[in-house]
Amino acid sequence: MNAPAEHANLARQHLIDPEICIRCNTCEEICPVDAITHDSRNYVVKFETCNGCLACISPCPTGAIDSWRNVDKATPHSLADQYSWDYLPDTTELDQFEATVMGAAELPAEVQQITEVATAGQGGPAMAPWSASHPYVNLYTPANPITATVTGNYRLTAEDASSDIHHIVLDFGTTPFPVLEGQSIGIIPPGVDEKGKPHLLRMYSVASPRDGERPHYNNLSLTVKRVVEDHEGNPTRGVASNYVCDLKKGDKVQVTGPYGSTYLMPNHPGSSIMMICTGTGSAPMRAMTERRRRRMDRKEGGELVLFFGARAPEELPYFGPLQKLPKEFIDINFAFSRVPGEPKRYVQDAIRERADKVFQMLQDDNCYIYICGLKGMEAGVLEAFRDICRAKGADWDALRPQLLSKARFHVETY
């Protein structure tokens, strides 16, 4: 996604924090494009040379190298500026916008198109929460993908369920692939289409937290539904989804990304998260929930409330594991629309049933709302918010812009 027009000349400048740099020379030695140099005071990064490859990030013993500021492409921080610093310059209003590293590849057209569709419900991409971690974006492109190895693939839904949803684990070995909760990756199916052209990449949300599906491993997981019919119910075969669902342990996969710099979770203690999803829209919610679960012992506070819709329990990804989570950790509200003998119940119905709680969270500046799933769910969820606000004497149409301006409202529907 590009910056707004008035900020179209933004670039993400890579810098080194002089306060914590120990001048060990590791970054300069490892940089493959000679973008790092130094004088007697500071180590600095050449703006016009750095391509954002991140080869220097992991080896740095202090983390000084992992510093970034948004700047105008025409007036970046010069080498003379950097040599003179005792500490990094303060962040500015420019740092709230999305920007790419100068010299880094542009986002693939299909990624931009999918993102525009997914975020249309909120009026375009929102800002990331103020406490979100810095995301790395577009490190690997269709022209230069990374190869991952499949280390796991198992079906999440029952064998007799109408939806065939798989949990896929990909390992990147020793090659850096930093990813955050809420980000996506691209997978390039092998072969060519009917016109003889390579298949386009397909984006999938990451379903694991930043430290890996297996903690402290360089891997991640995906939640993928096998596509066997189109939106009208006509038989079709999704090229990418069938390829991914059929992967075997040990198979090699071409991956691009990561993608996404705004659909990110808050990190500050006391922050709450309301999650609303259907089907494979549960992937980013699982990532955020697992991130919080692994940090439960820190007692950082903040609530997790989940509204999760599916046709039936056997078609709901992660239904079993979700039921085992402590109720004091997460407040789960299921909605099933195709259970025999039961009335149809959709995710917006579950939201209305929790009107008091939902309104409380909408009013809480420390609560962040995330919606992900089918495009068809979006209108019903927003109407439920509107009805709840109206019943409480508030105006949803006035509240939503406030949520967006505070980076508290995030929508990705397809």
Curated annotation (Swiss-Prot):
Residues 12-41, 42-70 form the 4Fe-4S ferredoxin-type domain. GO terms for molecular function: 4 iron, 4 sulfur cluster binding; dioxygenase activity; metal ion binding. The keyword Iron-sulfur applies. Binds 1 FAD per subunit. It catalyses: benzoyl-CoA + NADPH + O2 + H(+) = 2,3-epoxy-2,3-dihydrobenzoyl-CoA + NADP(+) + H2O. One of its GO terms (biological process) is catabolic process. Transmembrane segments: none annotated. Keywords: 4Fe-4S, Aromatic hydrocarbons catabolism, Dioxygenase, FAD, Flavoprotein, Iron, Iron-sulfur, Metal-binding, NADP, Oxidoreductase, Repeat. Its EC number is 1.14.13.208. Induction: By benzoate. Pfam families: Fer4_21, NAD_binding_1. CDD domains: CYPOR_like_FNR (cd06208). It is an enzyme of class 1 (oxidoreductase). Its cofactor is FAD; [4Fe-4S] cluster. NADP(+) binds at residues 274-291. Residues 143-265 form the FAD-binding FR-type domain. The BoxA/BoxB complex catalyzes the aerobic reduction/oxygenation of the aromatic ring of benzoyl-CoA to form 2,3-epoxy-2,3-dihydrobenzoyl-CoA. BoxA acts as a reductase that uses NADPH to reduce the oxygenase component BoxB. BoxAB does not act on NADH or benzoate. Homodimer. The subunit composition of the active BoxA/BoxB protein complex is not known. PANTHER family: PTHR43314. This is Benzoyl-CoA oxygenase component A. The gene is boxA.
